[in-house]
């Protein structure tokens, strides 16, 4: 089972109204947790693109200071994937301190981009592989994920060839969408070869249930605020 941590609505330090270093504080909790995530998705729907870029820079700078923490960072573009496609690549330039390992598409993105757009994203100047963490492997692939809420979304994600999907909500309502429940999750996940991660109201006590229902792992925003 793999685990995906999704950032809460944190801002980078210079914009935090409460002071302190919210990105560092969040990542420290994740780092000290008894279960290590395989991926962290940087997500904050309240930030514009420039603010999101600054947040990712701070997250990567913080991750580089954390020994033996080989988590991969994925950027949720807040529906601005086309902007990221149009910006790059720029030879020899990476705006992020350590770069990112991939992009997470919103359910809106799924229908606004084409498969060839993903090929352009793979050349993005936002991508940078930390070869010290990846043991010298210079062929580490760009990761693409997607948020899905129904069978139509999953079919489109499969057409684009994404590497994983977050299927939600499972146990709690999300933006007016009623919870799918485990029975529906299993039914939908068995219709695709894409690894599917349940999201929405989950904690570590749901791991065995998720595994029984064909989940590749579990994902959550508050997941790593809980004990395993």
What are the functions of these language-model segments?
Residues 175:
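Phosphate/ribose-phosphate-bearing ligand recognition and processing surfaces
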Residues 182:
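Short alpha-helical segments enriched in small residues
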Residues 200-201:
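Conserved donor-binding loops in enzymes that form glycosidic bonds
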């Amino acid at each position: 089972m793999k685990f995906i941590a999704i950032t809460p609505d944190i801002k980078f330090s210079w914009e935090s109204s409460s002071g302190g270093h919210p990105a560092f504080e969040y990542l420290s909790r994740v780092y000290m947790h008894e279960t290590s995530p395989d991926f962290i998705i940087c997500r904050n729907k309240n930030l514009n693109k420039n603010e999101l870029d600054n947040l990712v820079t701070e997250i990567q700078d913080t991750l580089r200071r954390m020994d033996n923490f080989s988590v991969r960072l994925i950027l949720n573009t807040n529906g601005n994937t086309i902007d990221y496609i149009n910006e790059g690549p720029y030879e020899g330039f990476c705006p992020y301190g350590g770069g990112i390992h991939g992009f997470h598409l919103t359910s809106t993105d799924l229908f606004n981009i084409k498969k060839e757009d993903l090929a352009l994203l793979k050349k993005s100047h936002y991508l940078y592989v930390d070869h010290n963490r990846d043991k010298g492997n210079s062929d580490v692939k760009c990761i693409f994920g997607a948020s899905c809420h129904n069978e139509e979304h999953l079919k489109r994600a499969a057409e684009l060839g994404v590497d994983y999907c977050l299927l939600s909500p499972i146990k709690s309502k999300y933006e007016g969408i009623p919870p799918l429940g485990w029975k529906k999750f299993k039914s939908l996940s068995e219709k695709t070869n894409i690894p599917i991660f349940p999201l929405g109201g989950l904690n570590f006590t749901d791991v065995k249930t998720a595994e029984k229902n064909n989940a590749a792992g579990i994902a959550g925003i508050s997941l790593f605020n809980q004990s395993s």
